[in-house]
Amino acid sequence: MIFSIEDDAPIVRDLLPDWRARFGEAGGRLELEIGCGHGGFALGFARAFPERALVGIEQRRKFAAELAAKGARHGLSNLLVLNGDARLLAPRLFAAGSLAAIHVHFPDPWWKRRHHRRRLVDDRMSALLLGLLAPGGVLDFRTDVERYAREAVVRLEEVGFRNAAGPGRFAEAAPDEIPSTRERRYLASGEPVWRLRLVKA
């Protein structure tokens, strides 16, 4: 399923989706992936954890459509793919404190200084992510750009996230970690991946 929304659409709390109706029992453990790309993580997650529901938001329509089609072909009823900007969609789709986890893998680092304001992990988005998570909920952030990772950990800790590895520190790969399509390439070549596992207290 592909979903889009106009940029100026109002936030109508009474119209928030009934995720339990959409996903059944899996809707009781709702997780979000921002930026699904080619869908390696989303597909792997949905297969590995059928008891959990994943909503993926991908801004590129082609990628979103392809991933949705793959999910349908594999009968992954616990996966829903939406097309749009997560900064606009997330507050219209999820109630505060409703997500068990949010996954942000390899977001665009926007290298040029004048483009830094386009980075996903800015002050406003960091606060939004914290607000959407339930107490004890986890933000799973990964990047191949060390500088971006170091800037992100400072900003995310400042808005109130607790760093499970310790202040300013990066996490090790979890035993049940599902790699994204892009991450597999880095792991195969031995290049480092910078991970954050941040918890809402």
Curated annotation (Swiss-Prot):
Substrate binds at residues 112, 144. Disulfide bonds: none annotated. Pathway: tRNA modification; N(7)-methylguanine-tRNA biosynthesis. Gene3D superfamilies: Vaccinia Virus protein VP39. Keywords: Methyltransferase, S-adenosyl-L-methionine, Transferase, tRNA processing. SUPFAM superfamilies: S-adenosyl-L-methionine-dependent methyltransferases. It holds the Pfam family Methyltransf_4. CDD domains: AdoMet_MTases. GO terms for cellular component: tRNA methyltransferase complex. HAMAP family: tRNA_methyltr_TrmB. This is tRNA (guanine-N(7)-)-methyltransferase. The gene is trmB.
